[in-house]
Amino acid sequence: MGMPNLGDMMKQIQKAGEKMQDVQNQLEKLVAHGESGGGMVKVSVSGKQKLLSLRIDPEIMDDAEMVQDLVIAAVNNALDASAALAQEEISKAAGGMINPADILKNMNLGK
């Protein structure tokens, strides 16, 4: 059995790097949504887990503690959805060659 061709290995590494850059770009475009309190608080986050929008039903604004709890729950819900979308994109790009959870951790997006 011969030694692997170093040139071919370098090409594969370069292709993998290009795929991961494509995934990074895709994650910027993905939007995940979360809500709590039956829709009284709604949030949207990017695939890179940046908060994009926050909507709070004005009817609940008198109860600050409840608003805080609902915002936290909605944000966490959206972040979980965002992480799932990111893992799905990485899995598609990797074609089973790598563990998406490891990539998310390296991108500071995993738990």
UniProtKB/Swiss-Prot annotation:
GO CC terms of this entry: bacterial nucleoid; cytosol
GO molecular function: DNA binding
Cellular location(s): Cytoplasm, Nucleoid
TM region(s), chain numbering: none
InterPro entries recorded: YbaB-like_sf (IPR036894), YbaB/EbfC (IPR004401)
Gene3D superfamilies in the record: Nucleoid-associated protein YbaB-like domain
Keywords in alphabetical order: Cytoplasm, DNA-binding
Family, per entry: Belongs to the YbaB/EbfC family.
Function as written in the Swiss-Prot or TrEMBL entry: Binds to DNA and alters its conformation. May be involved in regulation of gene expression, nucleoid organization and DNA protection.
Protein name as annotated: Nucleoid-associated protein Clim_0875
